[in-house]
């Protein structure tokens, strides 16, 4: 292989300065301030099934999840929290609705944080003093998680529906109650299933407080629909510097939420990109099966953890240009493929050898990157035309 200088990745372009917020510590993960935007998810198991819950947390951890939330609707779930919090590889947040007693149970169990829903916890306002005292004693942050589907009845009567203003008023009112007891170890979310309402709510909230913000589109829907909604909403807010931790809500396995969340952050240059496959969408000019080629290259490089961009192009129009811009690429046509490394053609191979050659060259580049100390990232795949 021709000796080619790979160099270090260029400093990613930022869309906006990060909103200034106070920083809290959720277990080992800092949230807010200048901490990187973190990605979290929620288990779908019954929390009382400790083995199944820990297994799912392990799978989430392996996929890049940094914080995990578990439901706590019953006493059996509350009883399981201590073991789960102790054995989990990542910080565990207890998700509490309806019963304030479970807030105290989660704090006592050693959960890294507790999410409370002020819209449905019985006599929540009356319990704030006790919750603040317990949380302060244990160093447990509280997320005030306002949700359009469970907004306080008084606010629904005032605004007629779950408007951005209603969501923000609920969140700031509850935060003010904690502040009265000198408790500010808080992060806030104001979730809605409509991305437009959600974005407007977070913009208003960001302008009115300095607490770290947890972004989420609630009940976003099945994988495809939920991915689109979350990408649109998160992209709008994060590009303005708003948001400190994200959870993509999908009607899909939790690991899929992490994949989407990481991809969103990478696409906004908020996280070091990992493996990126750039492939053309194909058209009548293509002289090779681009879909098959891209899938085979992706499968062959699965698990690679270096920031490597690989271009798989099917014709001579955009092919050579895209291939030159990538770390590694192929421009295909006339039964053969030109292999590029950092803009230089290193060889031409028969179409039947394209996948094999790309994988071999990718492995060589990855080894050189690791030897040169170029930071690795989580593997991800994107398709661009």
UniProtKB/Swiss-Prot annotation:
Catalyzed reactions per annotation: (2E)-4-hydroxy-3-methylbut-2-enyl diphosphate + oxidized [flavodoxin] + H2O + 2 H(+) = 2-C-methyl-D-erythritol 2,4-cyclic diphosphate + reduced [flavodoxin]
Binding site for [4Fe-4S] cluster: 280, 283, 315, 322
GO BP field: isopentenyl diphosphate biosynthetic process, methylerythritol 4-phosphate pathway; terpenoid biosynthetic process
Coiled coil: none
Cofactor section: [4Fe-4S] cluster
Top-level taxon in the UniProt lineage: Bacteria
Pathway(s) this gene product operates in, as recorded in its UniProt entry: Isoprenoid biosynthesis; isopentenyl diphosphate biosynthesis via DXP pathway; isopentenyl diphosphate from 1-deoxy-D-xylulose 5-phosphate: step 5/6
EC number: 1.17.7.3
Cofactor remark from the record: Binds 1 [4Fe-4S] cluster.
Single annotated GO MF: 4 iron, 4 sulfur cluster binding
Function recorded in the entry: Converts 2C-methyl-D-erythritol 2,4-cyclodiphosphate (ME-2,4cPP) into 1-hydroxy-2-methyl-2-(E)-butenyl 4-diphosphate.
PANTHER family, sorted: 4-HYDROXY-3-METHYLBUT-2-EN-1-YL DIPHOSPHATE SYNTHASE, 4-HYDROXY-3-METHYLBUT-2-EN-1-YL DIPHOSPHATE SYNTHASE (FERREDOXIN), CHLOROPLASTIC
Annotated protein name in UniProt: 4-hydroxy-3-methylbut-2-en-1-yl diphosphate synthase (flavodoxin) 1
Protein source organism: Streptomyces avermitilis (strain ATCC 31267 / DSM 46492 / JCM 5070 / NBRC 14893 / NCIMB 12804 / NRRL 8165 / MA-4680)
Gene: ispG1
């Amino acid at each position: 292989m021709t000796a080619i200088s790979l160099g270090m990745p260029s400093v990613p372009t930022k869309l906006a300065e990060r909103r200034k917020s106070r920083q809290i510590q959720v277990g080992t993960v800092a949230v807010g301030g200048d901490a990187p935007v973190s990605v979290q998810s929620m288990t779908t198991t019954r929390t009382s099934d400790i083995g199944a819950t820990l297994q799912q947390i392990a799978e989430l951890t392996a996929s890049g999840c940094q914080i995990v939330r578990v439901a706590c609707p019953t006493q059996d779930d509350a009883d399981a929290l201590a073991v789960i919090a102790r054995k989990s590889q990542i910080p565990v947040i207890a998700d509490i609705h309806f019963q304030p007693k479970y807030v105290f149970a989660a704090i006592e169990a050693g959960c890294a944080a507790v999410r409370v829903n002020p819209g449905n916890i019985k006599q929540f306002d009356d319990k704030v003093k006790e919750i603040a005292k317990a949380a302060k004693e244990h160093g447990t942050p509280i997320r005030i998680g306002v949700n359009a589907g469970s907004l306080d009845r008084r606010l629904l009567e005032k605004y007629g529906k779950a408007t951005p203003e209603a969501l923000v008023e609920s969140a700031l009112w509850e935060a003010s109650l904690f502040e009265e007891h000198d408790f500010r170890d808080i992060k806030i979310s104001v979730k809605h299933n409509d991305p437009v309402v959600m974005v407007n709510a977070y913009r208003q909230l960001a302008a009115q407080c300095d607490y770290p913000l947890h972004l989420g589109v609630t009940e976003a829907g099945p994988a495809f629909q939920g991915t689109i909604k979350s990408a649109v909403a998160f992209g709008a807010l994060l590009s303005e510097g708003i948001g400190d931790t994200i959870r993509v809500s999908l009607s899909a396995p939790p690991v899929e939420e992490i994949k989407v969340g990481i991809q969103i952050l990478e696409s906004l240059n908020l996280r070091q990109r990992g493996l990126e496959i750039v492939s053309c969408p194909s058209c009548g000019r293509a002289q090779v099966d681009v879909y098959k080629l891209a899938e085979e290259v992706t499968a062959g490089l699965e698990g690679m953890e270096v920031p490597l961009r690989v271009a798989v192009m099917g014709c001579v129009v955009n092919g050579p240009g895209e291939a030159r811009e990538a770390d590694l690429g192929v421009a295909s046509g006339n039964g053969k493929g030109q292999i590029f490394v950092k803009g230089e053609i290193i060889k031409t191979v028969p179409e039947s050898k394209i996948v094999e050659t790309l994988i071999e060259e990718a492995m060589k580049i990855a080894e050189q990157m690791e030897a040169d100390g170029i930071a690795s990232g989580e593997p991800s795949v994107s398709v661009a035309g």
